[in-house]
Amino acid sequence: MAKVLVLYYSAYGHIEAMANAVADGARQAGATVDVKRVPELVPEAVAKAKYFKLDQAAPLAKVDDLADYDAIVVGTGTRFGRMSSQMASFLDQAGGLWARGALHGKVGGAFSSSATQHGGQETTLFSIITNLLHFGMTIVGLNYGFAGQMGVKEVTGGAPYGATTIADGDGSRPPSENELAGARYQGRMIAETAAKLHG
């Protein structure tokens, strides 16, 4: 049975919802799953003034936690076409794990969100995936077995590189059922791959 970590940063709850969907998909494949978030770097007064969702159920992750899992799925919103500073800061602290090769051979994946359809989701996924490849991980994206990314009848996220959602400029659009289904599908694929590789 694979042990999967869904590691995320979510300012307004969109990525939190996607993280829980990824976790649900991994559990459907029989994995043991933990959902953890990275620490907020924005001062609390500023976060409250900007209506950040600070009451998230997931516990805070510690960098050394990463070595305990067969698979790690990383999610964060887009910040100017790249991952958030909160997630980048957390991953930057994993140099010791990198130096020891502690993440070699683990399965990795990425998911993201943006305000608009062309708001940098794919480049954000690439920024996450680049980190995971440097750690020596095997990447699993959102393959075209998920038919929900093939249609054009609705506005929807999703790319072969990972599940995504579109939040709208004011954050008013929650992840759609299709986007959540994509996240569940990717979570299941990652858990199944980890089980094959790690038994």
Curated annotation (Swiss-Prot):
<dbReference type="GO" id="GO:0050661">
    <property type="term" value="F:NADP binding"/>
</dbReference>
<dbReference type="GO" id="GO:0016020">
    <property type="term" value="C:membrane"/>
</dbReference>
<dbReference type="Pfam" id="PF03358">
    <property type="entry name" value="FMN_red"/>
</dbReference>
<keyword id="KW-0288">FMN</keyword>
<keyword id="KW-0560">Oxidoreductase</keyword>
<dbReference type="GO" id="GO:0050136">
    <property type="term" value="F:NADH:ubiquinone reductase (non-electrogenic) activity"/>
</dbReference>
<protein>
    <recommendedName>
        <fullName>NAD(P)H dehydrogenase (quinone)</fullName>
        <ecNumber>1.6.5.2</ecNumber>
    </recommendedName>
</protein>
<dbReference type="InterPro" id="IPR037513">
    <property type="entry name" value="NQO"/>
</dbReference>
<keyword id="KW-0521">NADP</keyword>
<feature type="binding site">
    <location>
        <begin position="10"/>
        <end position="15"/>
    </location>
    <ligand>
        <name>FMN</name>
    </ligand>
</feature>
<keyword id="KW-0547">Nucleotide-binding</keyword>
<dbReference type="GO" id="GO:0051287">
    <property type="term" value="F:NAD binding"/>
</dbReference>
<feature type="binding site">
    <location>
        <position position="12"/>
    </location>
    <ligand>
        <name>NAD(+)</name>
    </ligand>
</feature>
<feature type="binding site">
    <location>
        <begin position="78"/>
        <end position="80"/>
    </location>
    <ligand>
        <name>FMN</name>
    </ligand>
</feature>
<feature type="binding site">
    <location>
        <position position="98"/>
    </location>
    <ligand>
        <name>substrate</name>
    </ligand>
</feature>
<dbReference type="InterPro" id="IPR029039">
    <property type="entry name" value="Flavoprotein-like_sf"/>
</dbReference>
<dbReference type="InterPro" id="IPR005025">
    <property type="entry name" value="FMN_Rdtase-like_dom"/>
</dbReference>
<keyword id="KW-0285">Flavoprotein</keyword>
<dbReference type="GO" id="GO:0050660">
    <property type="term" value="F:flavin adenine dinucleotide binding"/>
</dbReference>
<feature type="domain" description="Flavodoxin-like">
    <location>
        <begin position="4"/>
        <end position="190"/>
    </location>
</feature>
<comment type="similarity">
    <text>Belongs to the WrbA family.</text>
</comment>
<feature type="binding site">
    <location>
        <position position="134"/>
    </location>
    <ligand>
        <name>FMN</name>
    </ligand>
</feature>
<dbReference type="InterPro" id="IPR008254">
    <property type="entry name" value="Flavodoxin/NO_synth"/>
</dbReference>
<dbReference type="GO" id="GO:0008753">
    <property type="term" value="F:NADPH dehydrogenase (quinone) activity"/>
</dbReference>
<keyword id="KW-0520">NAD</keyword>
<dbReference type="InterPro" id="IPR010089">
    <property type="entry name" value="Flavoprotein_WrbA-like"/>
</dbReference>
<dbReference type="GO" id="GO:0010181">
    <property type="term" value="F:FMN binding"/>
</dbReference>
<feature type="binding site">
    <location>
        <begin position="113"/>
        <end position="119"/>
    </location>
    <ligand>
        <name>FMN</name>
    </ligand>
</feature>
